[in-house]
């Protein structure tokens, strides 16, 4: 009997120890896409995020709390994305936060995450009005939204012309992926066209965008001063090749940051030279954090990229930067709710809302120069709005501007108006940020 009691006590202690160990894991669902026409972006981005998670774990976790995750393949499909979210949201103690990397999926999850009280990040994409945290408590378009990016693009074109006033009478084509993603910047582009007197010509491209003959015939007839390429996946090299075929100078083309990766330009060959795109993070392997990933993650055989030469590429570093952001949000939550403890989704939401990634902190993380400072608040879930521009010279993207912003006042006014309209439609009472802790 005594032996049985000792055995039972030992089993109880072992079970308690196992439970305690399990409680020290922070679960993050990963709604990824590694197949289909957008696989290059998904595999690079999510590969970078997972590489950073592995680096954090190799360094002991977040104050001892290890990260754990599970992937679900969405194929960049809205309905599959929602299915993946529902499948993973309650696993392993519940989701910390969700990042779909798809405007369509993000729209599909907008009401669900609010109901489930799980924060959703839309890092550099998604619905721009979610920057108003008074209305969108659970959504975080952290960094720079499409509206802010569109405003920065017009500011950059204004610089090229010698001033925004020089855009008056110009013609700018918005060549866009015919989806929620491609349509998202149109309200801001329309407002800026009205303000500065340029003509905006909107030309949609059907998914996936590997046929653009009719669109480039329209562009040739329109004779625009500039073409904004708001593309994704195979649409981008197709557009660059078509521009060369129809004699449109790539120096007059300006791409969204999802049209500004190596995978977008290399397939286009010489047709891509001189092409400029936006960026909200910088590529490269020289950053200390990237060197640590190479040594501690890839050196240990745990690297997520199948093609190791993609380390430091634009999509890879962008994914690393997202990993930094979500890890720092968890760390911030621990400061308030318990250092070394597993955070709930609601606690991580607070962390996302009180991020302060200063230049000094970014340097401490080994990422100085990779991305601009980010500081979020209850009212501002974006926290930056900065963009830099880069030009492809045939071998690599070279920065042509520092991080810069566009018409922030116009964008914020439109964010507030759009969020207020959404709140009225959904019968949401905006939060009083003065009462938030």
PLM-predicted stretches and their roles:
Residues 243-323:
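Extracellular/periplasmic periplasmic-binding protein-like sensory domains
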Residues 74, 120-122, 126-131, 208, ...:
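Venus flytrap/periplasmic-binding-protein-like
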Residues 25-42, 101, 170-177:
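Short beta-strand segments enriched in small/hydrophobic residues
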Residues 303-316, 327-402, 406:
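Segments of small-molecule ligand-sensing domains
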Residues 24-27, 40-47, 54, 59-133, ...:
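Beta-alpha junction/loop-to-helix N-cap segments that form part of ligand/metal-binding clefts
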Residues 79-80, 90, 128-129, 137-247, ...:
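Extracellular/periplasmic Venus flytrap/periplasmic-binding protein
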Residues 7-16:
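Bacterial N-terminal signal peptides
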Residues 17-22:
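Sec/Tat signal peptide C-region and signal peptidase I cleavage site
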């Amino acid at each position: 009997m005594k032996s049985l009691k000792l055995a039972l006590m030992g089993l109880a202690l072992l079970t308690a120890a196992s439970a305690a160990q399990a409680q020290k894991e922070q679960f993050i669902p990963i709604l990824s896409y590694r197949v289909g026409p957008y696989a290059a972006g998904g595999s690079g981005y999510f590969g970078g995020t997972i590489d950073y998670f592995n680096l954090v774990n190799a360094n002991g976790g977040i104050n001892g709390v290890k990260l754990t995750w599970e992937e679900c393949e969405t194929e960049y499909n809205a309905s599959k994305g929602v299915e993946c979210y529902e499948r993973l949201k309650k696993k392993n103690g519940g989701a910390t936060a969700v990042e779909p990397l798809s405007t369509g999926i993000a729209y599909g999850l907008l009401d669900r995450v609010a109901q489930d009280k799980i924060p959703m990040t839309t890092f550099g994409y998604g619905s721009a009005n979610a920057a108003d945290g008074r209305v969108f408590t659970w959504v975080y378009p952290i960094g720079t939204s499409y509206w802010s990016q569109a405003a920065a693009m017009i500011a950059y074109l204004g610089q090229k012309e010698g001033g925004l006033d020089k855009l008056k009478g110009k013609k700018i084509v918005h060549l866009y992926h015919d989806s929620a993603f491609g349509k998202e910047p149109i309200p801001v582009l329309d407002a800026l066209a009205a303000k500065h007197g340029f003509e905006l010509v909107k030309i949609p491209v059907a998914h996936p965008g590997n046929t653009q003959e009719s669109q480039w015939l329209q562009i040739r007839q329109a004779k625009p001063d500039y073409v904004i390429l708001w593309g994704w996946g195979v649409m981008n090299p197709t557009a660059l090749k078509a521009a060369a075929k129809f004699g449109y100078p790539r120096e007059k083309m300006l791409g969204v940051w999802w049209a500004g990766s190596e995978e977008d330009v290399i397939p286009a060959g010489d047709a891509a030279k001189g092409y400029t795109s936006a960026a909200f993070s910088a590529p490269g392997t020289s950053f200390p954090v990237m060197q640590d990933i190479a040594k501690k993650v890839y050196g240990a055989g745990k690297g997520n990229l199948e093609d190791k030469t993609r380390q430091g590429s634009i999509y890879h570093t962008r994914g690393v930067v997202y990993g930094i952001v979500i890890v720092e949000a968890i760390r911030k939550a621990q400061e308030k709710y318990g250092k070394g403890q597993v955070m709930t989704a609601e606690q991580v939401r607070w962390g996302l809302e009180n991020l302060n990634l200063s230049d000094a902190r970014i340097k401490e993380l080994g990422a100085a120069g990779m991305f601009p400072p980010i500081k979020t608040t209850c009212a501002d879930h974006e926290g930056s709005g900065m963009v830099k521009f880069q030009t492809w010279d045939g071998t690599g993207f070279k920065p042509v501007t520092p991080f810069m912003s566009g018409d922030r006042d116009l964008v914020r006014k439109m964010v507030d108006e759009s969020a207020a309209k959404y709140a009225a439609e959904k019968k949401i009472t905006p939060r009083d940020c003065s009462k938030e802790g």
